Amino acid sequence: MISEASSRPGFITAPADPVGEYPRASRRFESALLHIEVLSAMNIEKLLGGFANVAAILTPLVAVLAYSRFLWERRQKRLRLESYLREQKLFECTGQHSFLHLVATLGMFEADIMDASYRSKVISRNVAVDVAGEPVRIVLEYEPDDLEKELPKRPGRGQF
């Protein structure tokens, strides 16, 4: 026997009881439950689709924020190194400092100090030599802003 629920679109009826048919109320109840399950599955798919769209929008925003934070931290490290070397240059005669001294004083890694010194226009890297003339270590020194030293003689190429 075909139920009233099966003739309506969107309703799924339960299979017939092998012994006898379900009472009329239970068939409608099961049909309503199946309809609710189908609707909730559709809503979950829409909800997951919405979350996927939001994630697709937020991913590049988070990436831009992370990259800008990375650049800001690099700039802060460079400025901290430049200001420390500038102050030391004013109060000391040489103003040259080794990496070990800068690591201990500034609390930065050697790689960060080297990176900041390469990106700076006012920090020069020099080689300290021993009595025999052998290179011992690299020292950093603050050089005042001199426009002629900052501009390269051959545009587009670094000076060595």
Swiss-Prot record:
Keywords: Membrane, Plasmid, Transmembrane, Transmembrane helix. The chain crosses the membrane at residues 47-67. Its main location: membrane. It is found in: Membrane. It comes from the Bacteria. It is a single-pass membrane protein. One of its GO terms (cellular component) is membrane. This is Uncharacterized protein y4lN. It comes from Sinorhizobium fredii (strain NBRC 101917 / NGR234).
